[in-house]
Amino acid sequence: MFGNYGGSEANAAISLAYLGDNVEYVTRVPYGEMGEAALMHLREYGLNVSHVVRGGERLGTYYFEEAVAMRNSRVVYDRKNSSFYTLKRGMVKWEKVLADAAVFHCSGITCAISRDAM
């Protein structure tokens, strides 16, 4: 399925995997073709997605509008009611995720999108 799957956390994880690190990626994606396509994209870059939680109605999306003449580029986010937005405390098994982790990376937007995610 065509699309660009990303975001700051995915981009950081992919960069670390590209440099040879063992990266386990944690998020929540819906069942169905869109969720599968997102996971396939992450796997293609060598990310371990075994801790990804499945469920919710949709992927969060963002739209990029290129700059034209004197106007800057714009990004519009549509995250409300996405799978990650509706992630609840206890859905991620943090004990397992962090058991062998040397480093944990999380951006500030993660907590802002889903207060219960952490």
Language model feature labels by segment:
Residues 1-72, 80, 96:
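Substrate-binding N-lobe of the ribokinase-like
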Residues 41-43, 49, 68-118:
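Ribokinase/PfkB-type carbohydrate-kinase core domain
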